[in-house]
Amino acid sequence: MIFRFGFVSNAMSLWDASPAKTLTFARYSKLSKTERKEALLTVTKANLRNTMRTLHYIIGHGIPLYRFSSSIVPLATHPDVMWDFVTPFQKEFREIGELVKTHQLRTSFHPNQFTLFTSPKESVTKNAVTDMAYHYRMLEAMGIADRSVINIHIGGAYGNKDTATAQFHQNIKQLPQEIKERMTLENDDKTYTTEETLQVCEQEDVPFVFDFHHFYANPDDHADLNVALPRMIKTWERIGLQPKVHLSSPKSEQAIRSHADYVDANFLLPLLERFRQWGTNIDFMIEAKQKDKALLRLMDELSSIRGVKRIGGGALQWKS
């Protein structure tokens, strides 16, 4: 049984390598027309360059999973900007995709919490569709739309979770089918539990990303993992990818929802051990604040366990 690991967006070990450098609309608005275009191009070029740097870093370290930054392109979905970001950077996007395919990396996006489909407001749903389309367009430009996913949360409850869930099923119809086919859903730490998210995933035929930290932090989440996890595994069969789990540990007992800098191996071990009974290869995305540093430290700690063999910078053969 193989466990593979990855991290989110920015390699902390690299100098000045953020792939999420920003250009605010306030700053953009103060520029001339020529300066505006130049600023958009400059920031996007820097973010694409740092994405490439990060990919080379994870390839060199044998890390097989990576989550792209959602902020590669500044103001891509702002209604007063919404510019063509693909044409000027066709070469860069294509090179990123070739790296991903050549080294068989598993990649994903995770739009922010405002990209949701439970709102009764049409404008919120319209913005969600626009944001999902932006992420999908980047995957298309990279040539990896058929092998990556875009992960979101179900959304808010708006005072009535049953009504909001029904709203989700209605609103998601506005999402183009090719984008929905690459969408995944994740349980959250306050509102939608493991069971509730699983039910939506099963009804919509969408893969379920299980977040162990959210399960732990959500006071209403009482799922029997011996029942829920096999169902989670099954939701991934349609797209042919290994099941995916998000990992982090609480910052403290007082701040259980906050992500710690590193991952507490003892916090995760019960979950990792639980997967042994199904013998399924699992992919894990590390969401700790120290990102790649947290991943590499966790690999050192887990590989020291009797019966566990490290087979890559971010891969373990788990004990049978």
UniProtKB/Swiss-Prot annotation:
GO terms for biological process: nucleotide-excision repair; pyrimidine dimer repair; response to UV. It comes from the Bacteria. One of its GO terms (molecular function) is endonuclease activity. This is UV DNA damage endonuclease. It is an enzyme of class 3 (hydrolase). Coiled coil: none annotated. Disulfide bonds: none annotated. Gene3D superfamilies: Divalent-metal-dependent TIM barrel enzymes (3.20.20.150). InterPro entries: UvdE, UvdE_bac, Xyl_isomerase-like_sf. Belongs to the uve1/UvsE family. Its EC number is 3.-.-.-. Component in a DNA repair pathway. Removal of UV LIGHT damaged nucleotides. Recognizes pyrimidine dimers and cleave a phosphodiester bond immediately 5' to the lesion. It holds the Pfam family UvdE. Keywords: DNA damage, DNA excision, DNA repair, Endonuclease, Hydrolase, Nuclease.
